[in-house]
């Protein structure tokens, strides 16, 4: 006989394993790319697609009925064409980028001066961006990049853009 050594959350106490498999499995082929997941994604140079698996990530789209509800973290896959990236920003929680395919140039930006430090990541390499540290990325390669993004909270705030105008309208895409 199988014995669970940890208790299920109250809302899953009477859920069958068949129901669990339906509720907690998400397949890439079933996910529509969201090219308007972020306010800055409307701007040339920042265009990218988010594929949401667990929670809404930094998009603020936490009510997406097609995703697995985020608990302690979110998980998305980003698709970024060459020459595109995202605007410098912060989060209130840790953010991780884990490259699956292609190459991604990530940066940390010094608050006040705008000075940046860049590192290029390839497949199976990652960066962990601490809360409150200005960061971002660009695909400066010749091929598209796919990478995993995790945020350390089930419903994180919308991205905190370093640019004042973007920050003022950071929820404009919702």
What is each residue range found by the language model?
Residues 63-69, 86-91, 108, 117-119, ...:
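Short histidine-centered beta-strand/loop micro-motifs
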Residues 2-11, 15, 110-113, 134-174:
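Double-stranded beta-helix
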Residues 111-131:
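Short acidic-glycine-tyrosine-enriched beta hairpin
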Residues 82, 93-105, 109-111:
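Glycine- and acidic-residue-biased ligand/ion/polar-headgroup-sensing regions
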Residues 56-63, 74-91, 131:
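Conserved short histidine dyad/triad with adjacent acidic residue
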Residues 1-72, 165-174:
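A short, N-terminal "cap"/entry segment at the start of jelly-roll beta-barrel domains
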